[in-house]
Amino acid sequence: MMTASFKGIRISKPIVKEISSFGSLTNIDLHTDPYEKVEAKALSRSRLKNQSVKKTDLRITNDYSSLFVSIENKKNTIPDIHCNNLSKRPVGFTDSYVPGEALLCPDDPNLVNELFDDVLKRLREEKSDSGEQFHWDANVTLSQENKWSFITGYLSRNDKFLKISSNDSELNVKASVISYIEKLSCTPLKLKYVESLAVALRTESVTWVRYFLLMGGHIVLAKILQAIHEKKHLKSPDITLEIAILKSMRCIIGQKIGTDFYLSNKYPIDSVVHCLLSTKLLVRKLAAELLTFLCYSEKPNGINAIMKCMKNFANLKVESMNVFDLWLSQWKRTLLEKVVTEEKKVLEEAALHDKITIEYIISQMLLINAFLENIPSKTALLQFKESLRIGNFKSILLILKKINDEGVLKQLEKCVKLVSLDTANEKHFLKHTPNSAAHQSLLNTNMFNDANFEFMVKEHIKNFLKLLKEHNNPVRIIKLLDCLVLTLQADKGNGNSNNDIDCFYKELKIGNEQGNNAPGYSSVTSGYGTTNSKKVVASYDNTDDNEYSVSKSELYATGDTNNTTNQGYENSERKYVESSKYETDLKNIFDCLCLLFPSEFDPQSSFSAEKIFSKLKHLLTRTRDSYISEDTKILRLLNRSSSKLQDRDQEYLISKNNVNGNGNRDWVQPVNTTSSVSAFASPRIKPKLLFQPNQDEKLKLCKLDLAKANSITLKSEPSSAVSTHSFEVHLSMPGTQIKSANLAEKMETSKHKVFNPKRIDVVSDLPLDYRKSYYGRFSITDTKRFSKIENMRIKEVIDGNPFKAPPPAPLPPPAPPLPTAMSSLQKFEKNDSQIFRKTIIIPENISIDDIFKFCSGSESEVYASKIPGELCNPSKRLKQLHWKRLEVPFEKTLWNIVVADPYLLTLKLTAEGIFKQLEDCYPLREVTVSNKKVKEYTGFMPVDLQQMVSIRLHRFNSLTPIEIAKKFFHCDHDIMELVDFFNDRKFFRQEGLKKQLKPYMSSRNEEVMEVSEKLLELSRFDQIYTLIVVDIDTYYEKRMAALKIKSFLANNFRDFRRQIRKLHCASLELKSSLHFKYFLNLVLHIGNFMNDAPRRAKGYRLESLLRASMIKNDKTGLTLLHTIEKIVRTHFPQLEAFLVDLKAIPEISRFNLEQLEQDCNDICERMKNVEKDFSNEGIFSNHKALHPDDHICEVMVPWIPSGKSMVDELNSDITELKTTLKTTLLMYGENPDEPTSSARFFNNLNEIILEYKKASTVNQKMEKEEELAFLRLQALKASVKSNNAENSGSSKNEEVSATMENLISQLQKGLCDDSLSNKTDCTESSKQTIETLMNYENDKQTLEGSNKKRQTVVLKAECMLKQLENNNELKR
């Protein structure tokens, strides 16, 4: 039997598209692979057809824990699933709910029960770890289908492959991502896979990257990087692979979703931090860039995650070594070590020529400055500054200052400014801190000393104000700050910190002890005019004294809502919301305390209300006792800091009050300037929706989430847990399932709570879609429209009776019945038409005589009106038969007389099933018009131009558009490499784009160019185009033309001169070559000998030699050129030296003199235009018309004289070359005035030389073959002689054939020595054999030596046998 191991379950696809869905899954068994076989899928589909599913079986819930909330009736909220009782799928249920196959519940009940218990156990562990409560009533019995549905739902939430929506349009994207992950998982890993992944992450869509992250691709990269770091000795392929992985990570972190994944997962950052210790310079550079980006991207999440990872540095090599000293020790490795240890002259030379070293230094300095700017903890910041001062970094700074680089000097100045000591407190503190351990202990003990308290409070207030400025919902920060400031002041007379903390703790504990009240927070009002502090503690129970309190009668919806909702369900949901809000608020306070007091509160430890407030009470009591003597000085400081905070709070709330022009969106009560009212009592402010430009449509709207930060979280509204507003928010969540059927039917008439400026609760009837759009589930247009309707309703209430809710809107009247004349035009569904047809009685026997015995004098319309509409109209639309209209009056045609009864004919056709047959055979296909997807806003720039710009400027992805424009105007080296791209007419000749971007161009204010505020509304590519093209459209083309001629001459001047010189030298060698002249004279004599008298000439052009390769020898098949080559090599070998004289001809034949001359003329013309533009009368002479940051004049004006001299040199070389070529062509009989004469001359000469060399190769090869043939003939003759000598002996050979044995036996008897005539015959036959073989060799037919010898021996034996036979006949 299959074991119930939870890890053994593998599910391929979810049943519904939502992530948190309950339902069955589709596989034959549990142990299936994502890549299932076709047979298994086909079987699953066949089983799915037999199994029907209800719409209510697909349960959608917001959180799994909500299924186990214990309610008053002690019943669990998991719905029962009765699959066996389902007969058919209801109407309207489509396959879009079930994208894959469906896996039925296993037949083994023990397996289901064991798995269900395992899931419950895991849920208890998860909820206990997160501090949440978990309830399950074991007395309730669930069906096996219900348990299996819950198991599969839990798996679909925790499986990384099932979290992805199974949309059919995204299957290709998923397959591509899975293929990449499989390639990364295989061993050994190939470098090309990681490099192609980096390209895909940079070029593919955001959806592709999101799927890659959801499937754990970033985890695979981190594990590969971790495996590389675990090796003791790294090889070159490992380092190259490490660089490719870091580049892929850089592409992931460049997007917001990638940054969130890396901050939520710890070990990917650990691997990146470990790369700072690499021996490869480029690896450390990439790692520093990634960490710098994380420091600035998510504050303070990024820096906190990096600081946690930096703690592992000390355990890598030396445990006693300081964390930051270990990192700073990497600065003297590889190339940087050479730069630091050499002398000044060598240092400057290395800094100028080694670009990677400069970039590495800048990256490390950027990371150091990022730490100095973003470390939130004062302890860690002081420790880091101390490490910079006492470590090796100070000596490195002194040497780095000698490097003449603008970027390095800028970062050094910033670093020195951040590290410099501003207060005497830090000097005293660092002076007496010999090491990091003592530093930590001293910091913990002296955190609340008299000298440091003022500095500490200033720093904390500065951090809080920074958070207040960056985020749009700082009410929780303000509340906690008010409470801390109030309790930290030690009131000698009337103040009591213990009472403040006790009240605060009591208010937080109210919601947990009482079921119908939420955790209330007191609003604390502090008066700083005197030394006494006044506290105003008002809970939600005290509704008469608190202006912002909510009455208990308003906690629940009234009217129709109480009639439509179930009381038990409402109580359970309210309790769940109260507990979740209490836990969220408690977690927020704990995070803030960890940020304020890191020595007392550990972020990684578990927390509870009793533990938090016991520590806080102890801390504040100790603080109060140490400051009783200095209460006057502290209170003065607190008065000053709190007043600033109070002003800031009021300014923020007033600015939020005017979100819209009419001020009706959010109303905020102004804060009293004489007291610091807690922001928890202020009205709710809806979270701001942030538009992400690089996100796809699914990720376009997202709320600001700081849940992972060590500060106050802002992921939800600070609304009351027991208000109807929170109740409606919970009901309108995307994952919340309405479990009451009565509630689902009456939801359209439920009430929604609206807040007016006077805090009057108004109950009004609003449609459900408006209420959903109010919470951000739908489009912004729906939200604005609902806001407008809401404001109108509020205005009506204020103008009328503000204390009385208007009555609910009446139900709309029923629709009026259709007229009788239109009843036949009404469209019926298929089922409805079948019902109507059953009510019509059709006679069984209708004769043809009854149909055609008809009154011919009646008109057809009268009888056609008798036919019911149910019979003459088909149940669905059929293919149309288009009639041709009559061209004569209808009365004159046969159609005017009715020859058959239409009614009986219709009944007959219906009874025979003819109409039914027509409906089945000729249905009309319904054409559904698909809704065109609205294209996302990608900017004004065309898509093809965006792709071109993104490819060309990919190296500047880390820079902002303003920084790119700065490089452009400063003529940076990287920009000069892209001059050809900026000169492309497809780039800057976009008149329509310029016209659209003209309103966003910058404006000039004296000597400063002010960027337009509207520029931020554009996309990144439009911003770049506006800054570098539209702003200088008047002189952009001439500016880039000047830079192009400068770049062209710098890169191609030497190549031009080298080509010209080679042409010149080759021409001179051709003129002075005597061997070539003698060779041409020899060919002339040979040709005149072959030609007839009229065809003989005194000279010829070189093109005539090509004719020699076309005249062939009839015997050998060779050409005349082969004969000429053999004559020269045999009889005139000294003439072959002309090949050495003309060795440069093959190379210069590829040069085009005409093209070189045209390019030089073009360069001269462009140089004249540049010189004219930069003259006193040119366009660049007016500096006011230029961009203030443009350095084109500083770059081009000093270069123009050198550029002009280079152009003059090219002109002189071209002139001299033309003169030499002209004389050379005249010498060899060519016309130099023709445009292409020189190119044709050198091409023909090159072809002659190549053909001559081929002929020489062929001739030499044939001569070697003839020599070998002659040697073979000599060897054959010698073998014949040796065979004759061997045959005259008496030796025996057992391996000889039977013929040879007979011959040898006859020879031993002496039968061959009596007759001379027989010897003569043998000799003659031998001669004939030898002549035959010689003729065979003369015909140049190759024969093997063994075959020749075998044939010779056989012939010899035959002759001798013939002699023996003759001798025997003579004896007889």
Curated annotation (Swiss-Prot):
Q: Which residues form a coiled coil?
A: none
Output the superkingdom of the source species: Eukaryota
Q: Does the keyword Ribonucleoprotein apply?
A: no
Q: Any stretches that span the bilayer, and where are they?
A: none
Q: Which InterPro entries match?
A: Actin_filament_regulator, ARM-like, ARM-type_fold, FH2_Formin, FH2_Formin_sf, GBD/FH3_dom, GTPase-bd
The compartments listed are:
Cytoplasm
- Signal sequence span per UniProt? none
SMART domains the record matches: Drf_GBD (SM01140), FH2 (SM00498)
Q: What upregulates this protein?
A: By nitrogen starvation and by a pheromone signal in both P and M cell types. Essentially unexpressed in vegetative cells.
Domain GBD/FH3, by residue range, is: 104-522
**Molecular function terms in GO for this entry?**
actin filament binding; SH3 domain binding; small GTPase binding
User: What keywords would UniProt list here?
Assistant: Cytoplasm, SH3-binding, Stress response
Q: Where is the FH2 domain?
A: 868-1278
CC terms in the record's Gene Ontology section: cell division site; cytoplasm; cytosol; mating projection; mating projection actin fusion focus; mating projection tip; mitotic actomyosin contractile ring
List the GO biological process terms.
cytogamy; mating projection actin fusion focus assembly
Where along the sequence does the record place the motif called SH3-binding? Answer: 802-817
Instruction: Cite a single Pfam family from the UniProt record.
Output: Drf_GBD
Report the family membership. Belongs to the formin homology family. BNI1 subfamily.
Its biological purpose? Required for cell fusion. It associates with the pre-zygotic projection tips in conjugating cells.
Its assembly, as annotated, is: Interacts with actin at the FH2 domain.
Q: What is this protein called?
A: Cell fusion protein fus1
Q: Organism source for this protein?
A: Schizosaccharomyces pombe (strain 972 / ATCC 24843) (Fission yeast)
